[in-house]
């Protein structure tokens, strides 16, 4: 398959998460053998609870099985129940996955499409026709196809015929066995010309004794997916595909039973979908020296909502070091051997903590966990993977304001979760460099947003991925959302927004309500915000397009006939579809007067401002409201002579 890429540097910058891959390991075949006395993980195909077919699957073929992208896009995963067994010494993985799939297409499905990394292979797939009945083995064919959704640049795709068609809206549960190895690989980048070292800075997913890092769809297909092939050189389609998959599967539940083989010191903890569980170690032979003693470490992650993420798994080999501030001494848990970096992170946390406590409340909900790993960063709420180094606290503070926001407030809604964290980063800029610097930051971000927004948005609910409530790309759920938070601050005021945020974060029921945030803000501000949420959150109206139609200054006189200032009438046109509430400012050389004005989409509005001095200029919008073109509009005044 032919693919074109104009610049590897651009692709490397865009790659999903990233970092330096771990040292190359040669995978060797290995049979899973739990320690005697306790079964930690079993793939017994004759097990009475879930009997599986004993005939091994044929190896995947490179030829096409004539699968359509419509078939690949037809299903949503609504439940993952995973038994995962890892052997880090050989990068080996074997999985028993119970998958509940729903037909989200408009037509019945006669077969299902399941995909895993090309370094893995399907062993068996079965289903139950009755809830309490025996499992029925399903025949399937597997082939290899190119895709950059996996770091190897390929995936193993299984085509599974169904005993009977799956009608639209119906669900089916399959049990799939698959295995293989996940060593470091950056094949998708090196085959388009990337130097090995730079490629491995981006694609660092692997299973190894020092760190197991599996970031999921878009990086490594370690659990089954179903999506059309996408490529890094084809615009932003890979990243859009990742976002759509996250949205489609966000309501799923995930459960994991994990077993990790080890020799010597056991691994310390596992992080699944951003949550931590300690690993309980069971030694296979206590009579051997500790450095030679094999064992199995286990962890259980109970069923939980997946949310807007690709399921990820990290396993660390050492306990975290705690650091923080006097008020929150365990604010940061860092798994690192760069202990000299801890004081810098503690000092940076102390710098941004007053901002976070002022806006969100005195105590975080969780610690921020940092896994020290060379390469580009990866973030999943309050889990951060990045290279830790001893640098100036002021250098760390802007990014830490964003990351620590995830420790203070959690939301299942990406535009709240990520947008609010980005908004707090802008507030940090305002607090340290001034309002003009914060507005300049917003204006820079608005340029990329203007390119992404449609010129003629639909007047009804937008398709998933464009309205902020269902956004799937970061230009919306992070960039646009930060601007939305800034505008809400301008509309309701700091105190009302702080009160709403502190109420919202402590009541999970509000996050479950699609309009819970709107109601909370309306209660704290005593303002009707439906117009704003309709145009900026629930629908995608695009961006405003403002212009100054006219400015009419009229001199005022006192009762004695002496000049008493000016009345400046300003008419503003909005040629965009989204309503905007913007500041309208009249200035002289020494003073200014500002009023806020709401201009509905495709409409005009006017205001009159009384100005005590001699007006010289009118400005509409200060850069805080993103627009399709310029985000500030000025007009110099020519005063009438008397």
Model-identified regions with their sequence ranges:
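Beta-strand-rich binding/interaction modules
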Residues: 123-126, 265-273, 552-621
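Acidic/His/Gly-enriched intrinsically disordered linker/tail segments
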Residues: 418-492, 507-509
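A surface-exposed beta-strand-loop module
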Residues: 40, 120-203, 243-249, 291-292, ...
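Solvent-exposed beta-hairpin/edge-strand motifs
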Residues: 109-143, 263-265, 587-594
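Juxtacatalytic substrate-recognition/specificity segment
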Residues: 297, 318-416, 420, 424, ...
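N-terminal, polar/Ser/Thr-rich
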Residues: 24-94, 530
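Amphipathic alpha-helical substructures
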Residues: 364, 474-558
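Extended, low-hydrophobicity, Ser/Thr/Pro/Gly-biased non-transmembrane segments
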Residues: 174-311
